[in-house]
Amino acid sequence: MADWIFQADHPVDDEVTQQPEDWWNTPQHRDQIAVGDRVWLQISGRHNPGLYYIATVVRPVYESTERVDPNRPGFGRWRTDIRFEYRIVPPLLRSDLLKEPDLASFRPLRGFQGSNRPVPAVISSRLLELANLVPLTA
């Protein structure tokens, strides 16, 4: 099992509540993402950027013919399906994570690094120590 940070540029709270299993844009690392991998969802476009959810990959990466945004022709071409499992309460805010000596050098936490990035096991273990995970109910 691998760990990933997937990024959203906007809050997804309503989407998670209404549809706990959904596809996610995966233009990078598509040959490495596998069913069962853990996903840390980083929200970057809100007032308090940080890690807000944990999900699990439930379908291998696939190519979709559906085009989501005509202004971004490649967006949504490569996808994987994920199921949101936990809300992180309170969220692990970027500003707090960057104060942690063992996390401060992990580039994906410092800003936009693409839509999906691998997370080393040592980083994921530390994030799990810090996170208060609240299971999402269906």
Each model region followed by its residue ranges:
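Contiguous surface segments at macromolecular interaction interfaces
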Residues: 1-5, 12, 18-28, 64-138
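Short coil-to-beta transition motif at edge beta-strands of beta-rich domains
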Residues: 30-43
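A generic structural signal for short beta-strands and their flanking turns/coil linkers
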Residues: 35-37, 51-53, 76-80
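Structural motif
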Residues: 5-7, 40
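Short, charged beta-turn/beta-strand-edge "cap" motif at the junction between a beta-strand
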Residues: 43-49
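Amphipathic alpha-helical interaction surfaces
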Residues: 42, 60-63
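Short beta-strand-centered aromatic/proline hotspots
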Residues: 50-60
